[in-house]
């Protein structure tokens, strides 16, 4: 699963890099985390994870600090986290995670992207069953034995551990994500990246031309400032 996850994430990252949106999205996550649990990274686990993820893509420290500071400002917007579900071309299921300060605007935009592509926005909960929400934690695997680590971490929610080069991927149920991060911290294991992923239960294979059509739609979503992440059940190819 580690390789498949990296492939999906890699394609998503390339699109975000092209749009120069990565820092904006990470900054918004930092703001939301700080608003929710305060600006102290030592006592706010969500903020700690958001900052760590920002550092993993070389987000400058001054931008990270500025995002934390913005959270306490009176003029900073409150963001609502919303998930939209719909079908794109060729019956591809798509989930769009958003953080918005104007839900009416976001609904209209997301619906238009689906409609213009020949797809349709669905009702809340209509497609979520096609995906399984997981915690995915990437750690530095130097000096670690994946099999021994799995035995040690199974009581903390480890469902699968996959080694890929010098890195190890730890998969957990969504409800065990925070518990696992806390345990890794206590063991002084270096976390490179940690996030939740909506992994499709099954995937649909398309032709190269059809895939490109889907990728264009994904880019439309990801180009929207309200969109934080997009997941789909199209089979990814190298």
From Swiss-Prot:
Record's keyword annotation contains Transmembrane helix: no
Keyword field: Cytoplasm, DNA-binding, Transcription, Transcription regulation
Example of a GO MF term: DNA binding
Record-stated family: Belongs to the TACO1 family.
GO biological process terms held by the UniProt record: regulation of DNA-templated transcription
Parts of the chain that traverse the membrane: none
Cellular localisation: Cytoplasm
GO cellular component: cytosol
Origin species: Cytophaga hutchinsonii (strain ATCC 33406 / DSM 1761 / CIP 103989 / NBRC 15051 / NCIMB 9469 / D465)
Xref: Gene3D superfamilies: 1.10.10.200, 3.30.70.980
InterPro entries in UniProt: Integrase-like_N, TACO1_YebC-like_2nd/3rd_dom, TACO1_YebC_N, Transcrip_reg_TACO1-like, Transcrip_reg_TACO1-like_dom3, YebC-like
Main subcellular localisation: cytoplasm
Name the UniProt record assigns to this protein: Probable transcriptional regulatory protein CHU_3516
SUPFAM superfamilies reported for this sequence: YebC-like
